[in-house]
Swiss-Prot record:
Keyword field contains Mitochondrion: no
Gene3D superfamilies for this protein: 2.40.50.100, Aldolase class I
E.C. number(s) listed in UniProt: 7.2.4.2
Required cofactor names: biotin
Domain Biotinyl-binding as annotated: residue spans: 518-591
Enzyme class: translocase
Reaction(s) this enzyme catalyzes, per UniProt: oxaloacetate + 2 Na(+)(in) + H(+) = pyruvate + 2 Na(+)(out) + CO2
Residues annotated as domain Pyruvate carboxyltransferase: 3-263
Quaternary data: Composed of three chains (alpha, beta, and gamma).
Name of the protein this chain belongs to: Oxaloacetate decarboxylase alpha chain
Protein's job: Catalyzes the decarboxylation of oxaloacetate coupled to Na(+) translocation.
Species of the source: Salmonella typhimurium (strain LT2 / SGSC1412 / ATCC 700720)
N6-biotinyllysine found at: K557
Length: 591
């Protein structure tokens, strides 16, 4: 049986390797060559690409999809869809899910890999049904993980539930690289033995087991696998396409792909990747810590980046050790977007504040309340009681609690566009959906769609040289220099030669607040993380009780409620919505 290959170079490869920064201008020159290979599909959209396009790159993600479809008409295009979360970080009403899928199909999408971070089939149902109703390929997903709560029967039951919902195929998504070769063989064998379904396997290379897992799955009868072109593979990413093609050549599983065509593509990306060196993670080789922490590749690079922004890069090992503990408290949920971000952020909070759950992120509370769906086992009862505050957890499908919201969203976006003088796209619904998924970031993108200066600068293939070089450095050292407004970290040897040059971590979007509480004025309320003030809730002179929410901080793409550690009167509010703050900055005081 021939094995179908899905190459993830245009989506998950760069999401895992360099924080989803690959630009459309670096995709289109190689698109015709990719289209000529004969892949089963090309993953090129969804996941974090939508967010990255509008947050960092200043690209319209809908335009990206149309351009890729135009450039690659022969190969099915594939995306990753987060079920009821779509591409955002909350559940959306069914009418929004239906319209989003419709527009994705109209813009060129063929294959939808639909997953739910909780492995709750109820959260995948609306999206899967919408995909099939619009004539596209609906692929249900098992988000693979291990824990005392997960057995072979867990995956067989979920497979059966997805088949009852209605799917065209099923993917096993090993986002952390923890699927062992023998477990892959058993899982694929047992699913194939019991069900007539096309089966696909997605693995990450982070722990070093992915290539072996793919081979054992192929022996067991898997129909297709994900790989990435070699120059965009390995470490946080995926097994190399060429290696698997060569391995299977001449066997009953021969992929039929031409390795010379693949090598030309690899050569192209080998050069393109150099532009994005500033966003690369630190991993060299494999990382066995993932076998314990179960952190997906993309999450690991994001954690490194986010800890740098918090001036806490040295805390990575502590955070990795805390992640499994948080995961257990949250019912052994899988670590895949958005739960990976939620667990990671909570672990960072627990480490940086020096006290577990001193601060509970809004999204962590949502999982404890049941707002994201069923957890594999019950969550920590004490934590749940703390966030419920006497209320009851959600037990139904979370989206059943949501009223239709598309009409209201559309009216709101059109109103804001008129007020701000924004020209909406020809198909205005695409812009409406962009803002629906990312209200603040989406609106900012629409305001600056034709203003590249509002986004990250274009990546540079060649490292810039300092404007001036010290005539005679006193000794070797590491310095930060600014070149054309961009900061670079430079390592200078004893002889004055520059042996390393990388982009420095960007600063917060605006000048951080630097406020200090006057002596004796009360107890300062400080920022546990670096980020931006989302909303100030407390008012000057207000009397608050212990546990009352004072303000909401946006950090690491999550909203963190800052609560009063004691009863008191609010004095000296030092921040407003939109302000950037650093760790430890005083936000207000409680007298």
């Amino acid at each position: 049986m021939t094995i179908a290959i899905t190459d993830v170079v245009l989506r998950d490869a760069h999401q895992s390797l360099f924080a989803t920064r690959l630009r459309l201008d670096d995709m289109l020159p190689i698109a015709a060559a990719l289209d000529d290979v004969g892949y089963g599909s090309l993953e090129c959209w969804g996941g974090a690409t939508f967010d990255a396009c509008i947050r960092f790159l200043g690209e319209d993600p809908w335009l990206r999809l149309r351009e890729l479809k135009k450039a690659m008409p022969k190969t099915p295009l594939q995306m990753l869809l987060r079920g009821q979360n779509l591409l955002g970080y909350r559940h959306y009403a069914d009418d929004v899910v239906e319209r989003f899928v419709e527009r994705a199909v109209k813009n060129g999408m063929d294959v939808f890999r639909v997953f739910d971070a909780m492995n709750d089939p109820r959260n995948m149902k609306a999206a899967l049904q919408a995909v099939r109703s619009h004539g596209a390929h609906a692929q249900g997903t098992l988000s693979y993980t291990t824990s005392p709560a997960h057995t072979l029967q867990t995956w067989l039951d979920l497979t059966e539930q997805l088949l009852e919902t209605g799917v065209d195929s099923i993917a096993i998504k090993d986002m952390s690289g923890i699927l062992t070769p023998m477990a892959a063989y058993e899982l694929v064998s047992e699913i194939k033995k019991r069900f007539e379904v096309r089966l696909h396997l997605h693995c990450h290379a982070t722990t070093g087991m992915a290539e072996m897992a793919l081979l054992k799955a192929i022996e067991a009868g898997v129909d297709g696998v994900d790989t990435a072109i070699s120059s965009m593979s390995a470490t946080y990413g995926h097994p190399a396409t060429e290696a698997l093609v060569a391995t299977l050549a001449g066997t009953e599983h021969d992929t039929g792909l031409d390795i010379l065509k693949l090598e030309n593509i690899a050569a192209y990306f080998r050069e393109v990747r150099k532009k994005y060196h500033a966003f690369e993670g630190q991993l060299k080789g494999y990382d066995s810590r993932i076998l314990v922490a179960q952190v997906p590749g993309g999450m690991l690079t994001n954690l490194e980046s986010q800890l740098k922004q918090q001036n806490a890069a040295d805390k990575l090992d502590q955070v990795l050790a805390e992640i499994p503990r948080v995961r257990e408290d949250l019912g052994f949920i899988p670590l895949v977007t958005p739960t990976s971000q939620i667990v990671g952020t909570q672990a960072v909070l627990n480490v940086l504040t020096g006290e577990r759950y001193k601060t509970i992120a809004k999204e962590t509370a949502g999982i404890l309340k049941g707002e994201y769906g069923h957890t594999p086992v019950p969550v920590n009862a004490a934590l749940q009681a703390r966030v419920l505050e006497g209320g009851a957890p959600v037990t139904c499908r979370p989206a059943d609690l949501l009223k239709p919201e598309l009409a209201e969203l559309e009216a709101d976006v059109r109103r804001q566009a008129q007020e701000k003088g924004i020209t909406l796209a020809g198909n205005a619904i695409d812009d409406v959906l962009t803002v629906a998924l990312f209200p603040q970031i989406g609106l900012k993108f629409l305001e600056n769609r034709n203003n590249p200066a509002a986004f990250e600068p274009l990546p540079q293939a060649e490292a810039a040289q300092p404007v001036a070089k010290a005539e005679k450095p006193a000794a070797s050292g590491i310095y930060t220099v600014e070149v054309e407004g961009k900061a670079f970290v430079v390592k200078v040897s004893d002889g004055g030669d520059i042996s390393q040059l990388t982009a420095a971590v960007p600063a917060a979007s605006s000048a951080p607040v630097q406020a200090a509480a006057p002596a004796g004025a009360g107890t300062p309320v400080t920022a546990p993380l670096a980020g931006n003030i989302w909303k100030v809730i407390a008012t000057e002179g207000q009397t608050v009780a212990e546990g009352d929410v004072l303000l909401i901080l946006e950090a690491m793409k999550m909203e963190t409620e800052i609560r009063a550690a004691q009863a008191g009167t609010v004095r000296g509010i030092a921040v407003k919505s939109g302000d950037a703050v650093s760790v430890g900055d005083t936000l207000m005081t409680l007298a």
